[in-house]
């Protein structure tokens, strides 16, 4: 454990951010998986609605630096292609 006061504070804030980032990433992954599941079911309307939420989560994660912006774009493109193929 850190001894210096500022290092102790940084450790606390880093842990808080780590937990928050982890939750944000998990929510993003869940949204993407939900779209995939709906595509497999063949439910195009529900998949399109879930796609809107997944897009929002991906963009937010990219803007916060949790994922690279190109990964967000790639994932959105792949999801859109799967939905369009229905």
Swiss-Prot record:
Keywords: Ribonucleoprotein, Ribosomal protein, RNA-binding, rRNA-binding. One of its GO terms (molecular function) is small ribosomal subunit rRNA binding. GO terms for cellular component: cytosol; small ribosomal subunit. GO terms for biological process: translation. Coiled coil: none annotated. It holds the Pfam family Ribosomal_S20p. InterPro entries: Ribosomal_bS20, Ribosomal_bS20_sf. Residues 1-25 are annotated as: Disordered. Binds directly to 16S ribosomal RNA. Belongs to the bacterial ribosomal protein bS20 family. This is Small ribosomal subunit protein bS20. It comes from Exiguobacterium sp. (strain ATCC BAA-1283 / AT1b).
